Amino acid sequence: MSSRSGSADTFTQRSDSNLRPRRLISLDDVRDNNGRQPSSSGISTTGSSELPTLRSRGATPSPRPSRNVSPIPMGHPSRATQPRSDARPGNSLGGFTPNGKYQDPFTESSRAAVDFLDASWSSLQGIASSLLGSDTARPTSNGGPRSHARKPSRPDYLAKHRAVSTSTWGPSGPTTPEIGAGTQDERQAMVHAKKMEALLLADTDPSWNLNSRHKRRDSNDRTVQSRADTDQDEEALVYVHQVQPTDTITGVTIRYGCQAAIFRKVNGFWPSDSIQARKTVLLPVDCCSIKGRPVKAREETDLLQDVPSRPSIEDPSGSSIVPAPSPEKSTFSRISEQPGTEPEAESDQIWKHESWVQIDGFAEPVEIGRVPRRALGFFPRTRRKSVSYSDSEPVRGRLQTPTISTASSPIQPSSSPNADQHDSYHAGSPASRGPGSKPKGRHRRRPSGLELSGTGVGTLDRNVNLPGPAMDGLSKFFAQHLPTLAPKQAPPNFDSLSGNSSTVASINSTSLDSIGGAVEGWVRKITARAKSSINDLQQGTSSSQNQAMPPETRRRGFSDLIELEDGVESRNSSGLLAGTGWKPDLTRSGSGYVNGANLRERFPSASPSTSRTRTGLDRTKGD
């Protein structure tokens, strides 16, 4: 080994002295320099298949570095990848190279380390290329584009083919980025246009959204409304229950198996109402748990069929006069005997008779009626019979003669014993509120049997007896030429009741207002008479009082005049008028002229001298 290295050194010195000044650049050197990688990469690869593992590191320092040669542009870049025929396996490890360079031989340990580092670096580079993608033309250290592209590893190749194959099928995505493109105003305008387009293209048929609340409907909803009205117009079956005196809402609902809430809704009961206020109540058949068996009524028998098949109406016991009573017949006859009976006081009969059924636990058959379904779910009622009025309505239970009730003469003729019954018939009248309530002529409701006649509404005079216009000249003229428009005359017995309204009110009126007015008038009359009597008495007795007074008192004069308060009883005034010889006693301390509880000054004193004089007089009286 040492002999080899020594011969190499002598040969190198000889070649340097002989060949170095005459060194020429051959085409092989140019080809080698163009195909060699730059030193920055640190790795140079060869395309020959004969050298799969032999590589030289450009970073390894050479003991005899040569002068750098300026690169020559490649005319044929593809030649860099062509295999070289003159490459030899031993050139990279030492000895002479084709370009005349001498390389120091590596030891076996150095060669193994270089091979290990090359393998590790190539593996790391393959992993990095697979993650970052294939190598593209990168700029080299001298600024030119990289001509040699490394062959991609297998994972990168597979990933590239997979990506290419994935993009060849399926729907193509948007070619231009549309998210956040344009200004904010343009995006808002686009959103508004999209919403308007969706609104115009939407389905306007409301049949898909029947349960939603529409605030505005158009002509397209007519079909839906007609369909809903058809459903509401369908008839439902109900049990018609005749209310008994012992029935309660809870008992009836338990007996029929119906919920109390449904029962109250169908019949229009408030929570505080009682079932006794009705004569008939309805219970929906589909909401009740009990079912009945149909019963054939006697009225439904065909009268045109043969006589032998007709059921016998004779008593089986032998009586041919009185037919045998049956529960069905008794029930039907009882109901048919009352054709004019109103089922409810508040409203008319809303059901139509359908059939009769026999229910277990019921002594008599139960009637089944048919009512519109909208009547079962509407509450409260829209109209009551008590407030409805009709001119052709017959008056039941009272006379046709109208009853007169006015403020000036509240006396009513008691021509019928049913008048009190009629007053108690109305639920709203004060007479029916309690057993001890007193009748009030002023606030009593006018009976509905009073017919209005004539033109106009009448005058506001307190002496009006009947509704209608007053009997003036115009009314008399129309009464002569148009008898139908003439106002009706007062009843014959009304003349005897006319007279002084105050006298009638003071004698026969039971109204509190009339009594109060009469008492007030009487008190005013008595007070006025008492005042006049006192004034006359004071003027007549002034001379006698002056004579009885002492001289100094007479000189001062009696300037303090007094009068009695309002409301003095008549007996006091009569006593004052009867006593002609009465003189005031000024010597007593309890005189009526100085009593502050019952007297008041008519002319109050304006000077302190007068008050001082009155004080001295009082002191004299007290002594």
UniProtKB/Swiss-Prot annotation:
Domain of life: Eukaryota
Coiled-coil regions, chain positions: none
The protein, known as: Uncharacterized protein AN12072
Disulfide bonding pattern of the chain: none
Species annotation: Emericella nidulans (strain FGSC A4 / ATCC 38163 / CBS 112.46 / NRRL 194 / M139) (Aspergillus nidulans)
Low complexity: bias regions: 39-49, 165-177, 400-417, 604-614
Region (Disordered): 1-107, 132-181, 207-231, 298-349, 384-464, 533-553, 568-623
Comp. bias intervals (Polar residues): 1-18, 132-144, 328-339, 533-548
UniProt biased composition (Basic and acidic residues): 25-34
